């Protein structure tokens, strides 16, 4: 019930020391609930590396979920959508008027912009134009550098990790089990964006929904973290050489993209694992991107004191940071 974290000791070249971390017993139970509604939602352009945002909204504007909040000054086709409907209440700026955050007072009943469905006959150019226009392109990342994918180029292959090996992270077999249609729709269009394959890793003994998905190259992986990292899959299957690039999409973002393709609506939802030693009732919650963290943890933390630290990331990433 322990995990080993490794780091390089600068005084002993390439020798590893082990920090044992006890995490057993703190995992989320396989119970899914809707997250309590957050009053406010925020979108922070700094979450997207290399983007110089230009606002498409102003304070007091009423918006729909899926309306474009901002775009990249250096590429106006690269757009970023609102996860919720509501009213723009605040635009927080930093030095030199840099946009730090766009704050939205959410409607009690969410209203979605309908951008129309993407036809199954769509070609590569149609797909790129659609994903850019509806604000879904930023879900596609490029390696090296982990930046938003360059839609003007073509990756040699695309990668998805369907297995999260990081302790206390969400079990993707559980979170994705009811989204076969959305995942299939997303994977089918991603296939048209590369001359290579859409490569997906799953845990060897799992009952993953990806076993039912067509148009993918499936890899069974096993072993401790980071076996489930998409970088581990890339390194084993199709390493990135000089001058090459591959694209990656997170498994839960496939659901958002697929829903947009099938319904024309931007439903920016993710199922998150609420877990840890201070959580009274560890469980899974369906939350909307940009929600306030206290809306998720509200009334579910015991022994609240200065020793608690709430992280919107995995256990390993918390130690690395």
Predicted segments — roles?
Residues 78, 92-321:
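Buried, small/hydrophobic-residue-enriched core segments of structured protein domains
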Residues 77-85:
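Short coil-to-beta-strand transition motifs
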Residues 57-71, 90:
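Short, well-structured beta-strand-loop connectors
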Residues 1-56, 71, 105, 218-221:
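N-terminal, Lys/Arg-enriched amphipathic/low-complexity engagement segments
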Residues 51, 82, 98:
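Exposed loop/turn and edge beta-strand positions of beta-sandwich/beta-sheet ligand-binding modules
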Residues 51, 57, 74-77, 281:
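Short, solvent-exposed loop/turn positions at domain surfaces
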């Amino acid at each position: 019930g322990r995990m080993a974290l490794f780091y390089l000791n600068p005084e002993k070249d390439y020798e590893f020391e082990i920090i044992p971390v006890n995490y057993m017993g703190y995992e989320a139970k396989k119970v899914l609930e809707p997250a309590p509604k957050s009053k406010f939602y925020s979108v922070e352009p700094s979450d997207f590396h290399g983007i110089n945002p230009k606002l498409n909204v102003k304070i007091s504007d009423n918006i729909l979920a899926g309306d474009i909040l901002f775009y990249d000054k250096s590429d106006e086709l690269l757009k970023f959508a609102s996860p919720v409907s509501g009213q723009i209440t605040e635009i927080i700026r930093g030095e030199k008027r840099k946009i730090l955050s766009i704050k939205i007072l959410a409607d009690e009943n969410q209203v979605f912009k309908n951008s129309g469905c993407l036809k199954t006959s769509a070609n590569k150019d149609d797909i790129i134009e659609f994903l850019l226009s509806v604000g879904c392109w930023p879900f596609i990342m490029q390696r090296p550098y982990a930046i938003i994918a360059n839609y003007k180029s073509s990756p040699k292959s695309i990668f998805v990790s369907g297995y999260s090996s990081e302790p206390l992270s969400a079990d993707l077999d559980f979170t994705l089990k009811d989204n076969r249609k959305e995942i299939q729709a997303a994977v089918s269009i991603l296939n048209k964006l590369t001359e290579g394959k859409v490569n997906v890793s799953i845990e060897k003994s799992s009952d993953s929904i990806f076993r039912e998905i067509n148009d993918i190259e499936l890899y069974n992986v096993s072993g401790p973290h980071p076996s489930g990292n998409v970088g581990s899959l890339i390194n084993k299957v199709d390493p990135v050489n000089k001058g090459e690039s591959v694209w990656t999409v997170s498994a839960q973002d496939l659901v958002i993209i697929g829903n947009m393709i099938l319904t024309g609506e931007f439903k920016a939802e993710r199922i998150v694992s609420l877990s840890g030693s201070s959580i009274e009732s560890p469980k899974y919650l369906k939350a909307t991107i940009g929600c306030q963290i206290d809306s998720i943890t509200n009334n579910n933390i015991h022994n609240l004191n200065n020793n608690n630290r709430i992280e919107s990331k995995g256990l390993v990433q918390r130690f690395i940071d």
